[in-house]
Amino acid sequence: MSSTKWTDEQRQAIFTKNCNLLVAAGAGAGKTAVLVQRIIEKILDKEEPIDIDKLLVVTFTNAAAAEMRERIGDAISKGLDEDPESKVLRKQLTLLNKSNIMTIHSFCLQVIKNNFHTIEIDPNFRICDETEGILMKQEAIDELFDELYEIENEDFINLVESYASRKDIRLQGVVLELHRFAKSAPFSYDWLLNMAEEFNVGEEFNFEETPWADMIMEDMKVLLHGFKNMLQKSIDVILNSEGIEYYYEPFKMDLNFINSLLEKLSFKEFRGEIIAYDFPKLPLKRNKDADKEAKERVKKLRDKVKKRIIELRITLNSYENEFTKKEFIFLYPSMKALSNLVILFDKKYEAKKRERDLIDFNDIEHLCLSILTDKDSKGHIIPSDIALDYRKKFAEVLIDEYQDSNLVQEVIMSMVSRVKGYWSFYNGQLMFNEEEINLEEPHIGLDIPNRFMVGDVKQSIYRFRQAKPEIFLDKYNEYSEEEGIKNRKVKLFKNFRSREEVINGVNYLFKQIMSKTIGELDYTEEEALKVGASYGEEVKGEPIELCLMDKKYEISEEVLKEYNVDEEEALDNIQLEGRLVAKKIQKLVGNNLEGGLKVFDKKLGEYRNLQYRDIVILMRATSNWAPVFVEELAKEGIPVFADTNSGYFDTAEIKTMISLLQIIDNPLQDIPLLSVLRSPIASFNDDELIDIRMVNKNIAFYECMEIIYRLYKNEKLDSYYSFYIKDENKINKIIKDMNEKLKNKICSFIEKLKLWREKSINIDIDEFIWFLYMETGYYGYAGALQAGEQRQANLRILFQRAKQYAKTSYKGLFNFINFINKLKFSSGDMGSAKILGENENVIRIMSIHKSKGLEFPVVILSGTGKNFNMTDLNKNILFHRDLGYGPDYVDTERRIAYPSLVKNIIKNKIRLETLSEEMRILYVALTRAREKLIITGLINNMDKAVESWLNLSDDKNKVPEYAVMNGKTYLDWIGPAIIKHKDAVSFREELKMSSELSNIVDDKSKWKIELWNKKELLKEKVEEDEVEISEKIKETLMNLGESNYKEEIYKRLSFKYKYDNASSIPTKLSVSDVKKQFILDEKENTEELFKKVELRKPMFMGEKKKISPSERGTIIHLFMQHLDLKKAENKEDIKEQINRLIEREFITYEQSKVINPYKILKFCRSELGKRMINSNNINREMPFSIEIPAVEIYRELDKNIYKDEKLIIQGIIDCYFEEEEGLVLLDYKTDYVNDIEEIKNRYEIQIKYYEEALNRITGKTVKDKYLYLFSVDNYIKID
């Protein structure tokens, strides 16, 4: 029936029968089309047609289920067009509405509703709102803790003392998190108790035989492979270098030792050999012909290996059996108490839900599981009678996105599928055993396997929701591609989405970095994507672009000091990356004069110009980055929309309405009250609010308003107010003097507020909120503002939330406000209302997770230099599905706490799993692109980063696993892979590192690497403005046609003021500006002279994280200004002077840490310091101003035109002192010194103007000029 030309592999996936079939479908492989076609072939099979309601099709989302139904419906309708009399087609079309195409949760709900009587649940149950559930959980845990405190439960008290800190909230958080975590296990009580029992070890316990020991060994072997590479590399250098062959033997011994460790199978032998090995000493031979550079290089590599082996030895020493046993025994009571606490909490929470006839989202799967499972006499988990009925009913069970299944879902699907076997616990883990089970009655036909599972483990990115990619991987490794067997797999790796350039680039990168260790799968040629899409020859594909920006931007100490900014504050790095992306987009889209990228339109069947809607910017997380990118793109006139999950509660309209609700509930809250008073709802101005506060500064603001209201209305004040009013005459005078209009405003607001408070009691919260919208006119006001449609949509969401809340068991305004507060913090805020349609011509910014399943002509992946989020590893108790609990060891009696041995193991395991998840997330991001892929990222120090990348490039085929394992950003993975690619040659040459790489990879993928820096991005803005003006002039002239005035118009529009440069010359310059200008003249003339100033956020708006270079310089200069040279004979004297500055509040204690007494003492004891001490005339921090000709600074100016232009040069001379022959000028520098000549050149012009200033001011000659360099404890003379 289908006209689609299927590949051989797709046909196998569509037509293979009578087996459990696993379809591994790579990105863009058309798995949905294959799944739909398989269903169509099943229901339209001429020999054995299957009614569509006899198929269970489980999808990941409701949208996917709806799309599948629609596709199947279209196929049936098309068949009816060809054969209108077909009874089979008509029947299937009728049955389509009854089809079981749904999400796993929809199926579970169906099972519960059809079998509610078996689990004693009210048939009228309701699924509780997420936040309603949170409120009930909080109630339950508060009540539980109170009860346990009351009965003084000893285990609970010990648990509190060990893990609760000062407040219970920390332990409550642990219980709630563990409860959520346990609910993703099929039988959560069993799992909780089993995990606690892992700590219940006896005298026979032997740590060396536990799974934890094997895990330590395997993790360490990954590192050892890295050490092996380093030693092998060293041996190659030794054998190919002159005069260091005597190093060969000790290096070879080390390599043999590493190889021996890698072969060890038992932890005991592995541990013993590492602890016993003694590194041979290197021979101390001297050979004048030896290659010193090579010798030093191999020594450094060996020292690095030795250091790491010693660290491993220390770690392994800590895993001594008796010590480990004692630790387990000590932790057992706490872990058992924790498991029991979670179970008690769950029972209390369950009771609260049952009281209200509620179930929550987790209950849906667990209740279904309890209906579908039973236990046999041996305790094995087998299908219930109800499950067996489902097995009879469903001819096939088809599961989409199988890689994202969790263990609960896997057990449920195994109960309704025709699989032979049972589930049971083994060493605390639930495992499936593929064996025959004895059922009470035979079930004919149920022995034919009927599971169809499709997915791509490389796109499993939901581990944070407890997805278990191992479920897919286990089958992938066990199933065979052989025909005619019961467990079979088919691979669909032909990509019908992307251009060859995208596919080749993705394949190259992931062959280099994805492995079983990180990614949980070896990305081999067999796993690689194959080109399946055709884009014709009309437009050639483009290389993948890697745009790197160096965060390091050389700004001297003087400039930092002058503007009082930190390097990081000079311009926000996210902002700069956003600007970089904006420039790439402008180039891609093009303009009227120059065409941009052409993309193929599938609907039109031809190429067209790229539009904004064709571009997506993907980020790992959007909360902090997306708003900055939106701002930067909007500045460039690029339409953009960010699909985020945050920011809703920060919008002005929602803040105002929540504040209004808060003061209606309780007006004695100053901050929300002032927010409402200053809003258009009340329209008080600042002066009016000050007048109100003058009534009394010690009471709530509302009480001030209440006093004014009562006295103005001649009402008597009650005793409460009388207590605060000591002088009623004074208050009456304040009110009498108060503006009549203000008094009326106060009375009007108080009366309205009282009416609203009364009304809030009598109507439902959703009605009340809508009443407030209309009553205050705020809904209309919000709509009249800029982005009014968006604001009104946000207000409607608040109304909808209130409507949901009104249906819960909680009532009242107070509880609704709590509900909203819980929503803020429990759900991590929400995104603003979505008002954009699919066809809006805007750039979209979204998280990688939200992009899964989508595709775009152009993908820009940004933020690749951002660190992975590993904050969860810092919690005091870690949880792992297979390994259980990883607690801190806390001994309250001895007051000691440290990570337990098992916590360190689990921490490392979670870290590796997190990195594997990040690897797969990167894969998802890069495979969204159809035609063009751009990757952008920031790097702290480009030279250092590239040097480290080059050190990892020995293996052409793979970035070393240990390097991938130590990666902290996506660029840490991408960089080492790309630096050795043939297309990176020019990039390496630009960084003067082309000679350092011998292993160039000649891969068919195409890459374009661009290096950007901050200065370029700042400079280009001004240049673009000038080009834009020029282009507008050209456009205007073109539109004139054949006008007689064309030449005159061009002349006028192009006119430049003769003295235009003079308008840009400042009247005053600092010496630092002058110095900077002269440096620029040598490099780039005066390109920065007339540049626009980039506005930055004030310091008080940013969080101060560290003392900046400018602050450090200022602090040291301040100390040198106040240093008493006569009392600086030793370090103690200097420390005393530092403390005196702290006492006088010149500096803080934190700031004082940058002053090194030893360095100050070295200055005092230097020859220059002694000369200064011996002088009778010392002057410090002397400000000056001198006038000089402008052409002396701006040498490119026409001297005839600008000969009379003058500039004022200002500055502060650090120090000068007088000797018999003249003055000695001294300037302190705290810059890092790399090259003495460079420092001299940098500050020569500055010192020149200091000298001239001293000559003019004192009338005396400057005999010597010095820079004192604190970084190297030395001084240099300036000639």
UniProtKB/Swiss-Prot annotation:
Cofactor: Mg(2+)
InterPro entries: AddA (IPR014152), DNA_helicase_UvrD-like_C (IPR014017), DNA_helicase_UvrD/REP (IPR000212), P-loop_NTPase (IPR027417), PDDEXK-like_dom_sf (IPR011604), PDDEXK_AddAB-type (IPR038726), Restrct_endonuc-II-like (IPR011335), UvrD-like_ATP-bd (IPR014016)
Pfam families, sorted: PDDEXK_1, UvrD-helicase, UvrD_C
SUPFAM superfamilies named in the record: P-loop containing nucleoside triphosphate hydrolases, Restriction endonuclease-like
Record's catalysed reaction(s): Couples ATP hydrolysis with the unwinding of duplex DNA by translocating in the 3'-5' direction; ATP + H2O = ADP + phosphate + H(+)
Gene Ontology biological process: double-strand break repair via homologous recombination
EC number: 3.1.-.-, 5.6.2.4
Molecular-function GO term, any one: ATP binding
Quaternary structure and interacting proteins, as annotated: Heterodimer of AddA and AddB/RexB.
Family as reported in the entry's similarity comment: Belongs to the helicase family. AddA subfamily.
Name of the protein: ATP-dependent helicase/nuclease subunit A
Organism: Clostridium botulinum (strain 657 / Type Ba4)
Protein encoded by which gene: addA
